């Protein structure tokens, strides 16, 4: 593996996996970030962090330089789920600030691609698709849907399909 993601729930003061009030400059007590990052580095694996967009918006000026210091490879920013003018500007501010700190970006819960990655090549991908994670709660992601993506969504650029969504196999 080239990269690994530390998904939702790692940041301090979070009250749940979709918490928008956590402190993304600190971890919960159960997460020893220096130890995780050292182990990943020993295996030649770079680490990404999941962020709720509201936390990124509130703390990016403080957090992104910290992540660069930690050696974080990239950020998976989630739950924007809209494409109004303010949010489009937010995307631009994030990728610009991330580029300044050598961070890759994956916008999850994102609107359709708009060419921003041409200006900011650190914008690796964005979701904008009904991906594999939906198999945890829906039957809509099926072989026909997956084939269709190559001829529809992928024409607009790379996508975050979220491969590897796990579910409770005892159901």
Please report, for each region that a protein language model flagged, where it lies by residue.
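Aromatic- and carboxylate-enriched substrate-binding clefts and catalytic-loop regions
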Residues: 5-171
């Amino acid at each position: 593996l080239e990269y690994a993601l530390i998904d939702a729930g790692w940041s301090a003061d979070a009250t749940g996996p979709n918490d928008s009030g956590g402190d993304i400059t600190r971890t919960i007590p159960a997460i020893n970030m220096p130890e995780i990052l050292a182990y990943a580095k020993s295996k030649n694996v770079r680490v990404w962090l999941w962020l709720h967009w509201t936390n990124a918006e509130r703390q990016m000026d403080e957090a992104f330089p910290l992540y660069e210091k930690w050696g974080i490879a990239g950020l998976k920013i989630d739950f924007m789920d809209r494409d109004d003018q303010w949010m489009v500007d937010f995307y631009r501010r994030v990728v610009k600030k991330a580029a300044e700190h050598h961070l890759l970006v994956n916008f999850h819960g994102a609107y359709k691609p708009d060419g921003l990655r041409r200006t900011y090549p650190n914008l690796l991908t964005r979701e904008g698709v009904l991906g594999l994670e939906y198999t945890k709660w829906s039957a809509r992601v099926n072989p026909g849907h997956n084939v269709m993506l190559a001829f529809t969504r992928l024409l607009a650029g790379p996508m975050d399909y979220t491969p590897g969504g796990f579910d409770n196999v005892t159901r």
